[in-house]
Design a protein with these regions (language model features):
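N-terminal substrate-binding region of glycoside hydrolase catalytic domains
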Residues: 49-111, 116-123, 128-148, 250
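Beta-strand-rich domain onsets/edges
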Residues: 1-63, 86, 95-99, 125, ...
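Active-site cleft segment of glycoside hydrolase catalytic domains centered on the general acid/base Glu
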Residues: 99-109, 136-234
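Active-site-proximal loop/turn and secondary-structure-junction residues that shape catalytic pockets
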Residues: 61-63, 93, 130-132, 175-179, ...
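Substrate-binding and catalytic surfaces of secreted/luminal carbohydrate-active proteins
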Residues: 32, 213-216, 240-256
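Conserved, mostly hydrophobic/aromatic
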Residues: 28, 87, 117, 160, ...
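Distinct, well-ordered alpha-helical segments
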Residues: 65-76, 182-185, 224-242
Length: 256
């Protein structure tokens, strides 16, 4: 996020943050040299085989799942394995897919993707636990109100967060709370009747998996200056002030 009053030397500040957040010092012990003079002309080649800084991409988790089940990594899976250390399912872990039918849960693609990632020393981000756009929820879910709706929300949280506790390091808990008109989506408020429902959702998720980082996520915040930036800040500030355990924020961008 770069505000209107961005610093003139923003690239310089960014490089300072890279030095601070993405890099660390390393010590190399060299044995077999009798004196420091022997090391004057020593040439040392270091090849980095992996890194701790998360660098990932969205993938079609059905294709990853197919690779896992077949035991063969096709070109798609091989490319993901070679270039990234973190994955996020574009669709297959979202509630609309996992819970198409009431009281039925389809975690097959998600489970297989997590297992495939573990085999290849990769991580999977949970995306997304809940979605604030009404139309992106199962039809049966959209017809619930009051206590029945809240129970369905909690069932989704309990099922998904508990299932991947210790396996998924991060969850996008509530996805896209800003609509096309730059106003807050009120799906959870409208259906639950509870003005504090968003905070309760985060609190329940954190209680089930304390070690998992919980995120808000939204799109069009960085490159759209029509009010989404300010509204996102307002949402975050309001939730933090109400005691919502938010560990990070997502800035979703799609580029081709």
């Amino acid at each position: 996020m770069i505000p209107d009053d961005e610093p003139k030397d923003w690239k310089g500040e960014a490089n300072q943050q890279i030095e601070k957040l993405r890099k660390s010092d390393a010590e190399i012990a060299i044995k077999g040299i009798k004196s420091f003079k022997d090391a004057d002309n020593l040439q040392l080649l270091v090849s980095q085989t992996s890194h701790n800084f998360a660098f990932g991409t969205a993938v079609d988790c059905q294709r990853i799942s197919d690779c896992f089940e077949s035991g063969y990594d096709d070109e798609y899976c091989s490319f993901a394995k070679m270039n990234y250390n973190m994955l996020v399912c574009g669709y297959r872990m979202k509630i609309k897919y996992v819970e198409m039918k009431k009281d039925e849960h389809n975690y097959k693609a998600g489970d297989n993707t997590v297992a495939w990632a573990e085999m290849n020393n990769m991580k999977v981000r949970g995306h997304s636990l809940l979605w604030a756009k009404a139309e992106n929820n199962p039809s049966w879910y959209r017809n619930l109100y009051g206590e029945e709706f809240v129970n369905a929300v909690y069932d989704r949280i309990d099922s998904a967060v508990s299932r991947y506790d210790g396996k998924i390091p991060q969850w996008d808990v509530i996805n896209e709370m800003i609509d096309q008109g730059y106003e807050n989506h009120t799906f959870y408020l409208d259906h639950s009747g509870d003005s504090n429902i968003r905070t309760k959702i985060f609190q329940r998720s954190k209680a089930l998996s304390p070690g998992t980082m919980l995120f808000l996520n939204d799109y069009g915040v960085v490159d759209d200056r029509s009010g989404r930036f300010e509204l996102y800040q307002e949402q975050i500030r309001e939730l933090l002030e109400s005691g919502t355990p938010i560990d990070g924020i997502g800035l979703q961008v799609r580029k081709t």
